[in-house]
Amino acid sequence: MIHYTNIRNIFSVPDTLEDGAITNESGTVKRSSKVSFIEDAKICREIFNIIDYTTLINLTDIEPLQYSEYIVGDEYGWHRDVHDEPYSNGLVRKVSFSTILNDDFWGGEFDIETKNPMYKKRYQTFESEEYNTIIFPAHMWHRVRPVKSGVRKSIVGWLLGEP
């Protein structure tokens, strides 16, 4: 199940960003963006409580949040947020979320593969509305399309639970 909600006044933009490029085995770039992690326990707990209440899934923890900036041409190809094995504490990523922090950019649409026969496409596109949050199972394939103008700013996160 995919949830869509609006979260405001929780985040502040980090001061420094790192190269967030991710490549696959063949060297092809899967993600091009700048990132920073937010480990503020109060913010993480507030987000955890909102999503835990919204999803009604047995969740036990949240990873540090990731702030990302995508400039013109940046994207993140199709991927899932799950790992092959549980973490050392036995937990796995159960729920992912993405919050758009601005709406003064073009492109950078967020797609989730649904394979739902109700849609003509195999995926559903979520338009970039400021502070709207998409909450979805971490095993679902998703992507960020290339940004065409401006800078796309977002917070993403992953909530954990038992397999």
Residue spans for each PLM region:
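Catalytic core of non-heme Fe(II) oxygenases with the double-stranded beta-helix
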Residues: 38-163
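Non-heme Fe(II)/2-oxoglutarate
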Residues: 1-59, 66, 75
